[in-house]
């Protein structure tokens, strides 16, 4: 049976099936559970989670319903539970009873809904079959894909109790360290914590207490840890152990132009993490406004924005995967900061925005920074960044991930939610009535104008609203002629409809009424 995809999605959204899903996959189940079901299960679990709908196939914006009766779907449900608990089928069962349900779409046509949560990093990789190197999948904008062995090995390394930066580097020596860097670290520690007991130690025991030098229990030999070399090492030594290591700061005068200032490993300095941080920070923070704050009778030149920016900088170093590709890249624009680091996030995006749960990839490097007062250990770092940007009435920080190679990008825009020039542009396109729209709709249009488009996921991070509420607003903005959708389903993006302008009638009144009607729970 052929149905418009949007119609089926609307039915399922009204039933509350899709409300929390970031991604969606349809599967036909006419002949039983398809093999691709398990590929999607693995892919969702190793990514940001998602929803699988069995009993539907999708093509060219249409859904083709299998027409399965309830008795057939219940049989597939029993088969599903038997298979997911079989270790030879899949490595781990992440689901509970509430994650799997039968839904009637229309008449006697049923589908099986499977909501897959993102797996904790401790359970990754989630793979099908008995060979993780061949049975691990992940998700990107094109769909499910089989991971390369290198991706699988990095997931496995992140799942181990010993963090990658705590491992002893075989054949490393003290000669691999840049001692002037170590002296600088001591001096800063002395300035912030003059009575710290580590300061009385000689270099070797000092490095041991920091976790930079330790014994390999398997061989009985001492050496530098990955953290010790990355933090205090010589550039050549770092690159011998970490061939893809790269750190790069760029200051760019305006969007699209070439950098006007840059710090990168050019051979004139030892490009370890400590030197990179302390060379970049003054340039990164130079243009920030300095508040007048008093602390114990003394003026403080740094406020919440400085602290948040430093937290973001430290986090990009603490959470980076130094075996990954691309290195750490920091870009400063006149109106924004970009922090990009190799690796994938060890907590779901939703958890990052909530705060309160930090899972650093490099705990020893985090300790080294936290001794100097940088890098939160209590999971409040993201909240500090969000709070500071909110206090300045700037657009909410946006974090995104890409893979192949894995990269995490934190975008900190110093723009108000509704810039004057954006409102003027919207007024030029749609007429003066656009200013009378309710706040969230105006934010959606302004974001689409500034960023070239919006998605449900982007707006969830911006508006702090449920995906179902945002879906209603986006649908209404499309129906009234303000937005044009591209693609269909949960991955739809929306762009300003610059071709036809405002229809007759009051959009903001229509939207308010329609939203209130759909949200009425009385």
How would you name each of these model-derived features?
Residues 506-522:
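Amphipathic alpha-helical dimerization/coiled-coil segments
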Residues 1-304, 310, 314-426, 432, ...:
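Conserved N-terminal catalytic/coupling substructures associated with nucleotide/phosphate chemistry
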Residues 438, 488-511:
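Short, cationic-aromatic polyanion-contact patches
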Residues 434-454, 522:
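Short amphipathic alpha-helical interface segments
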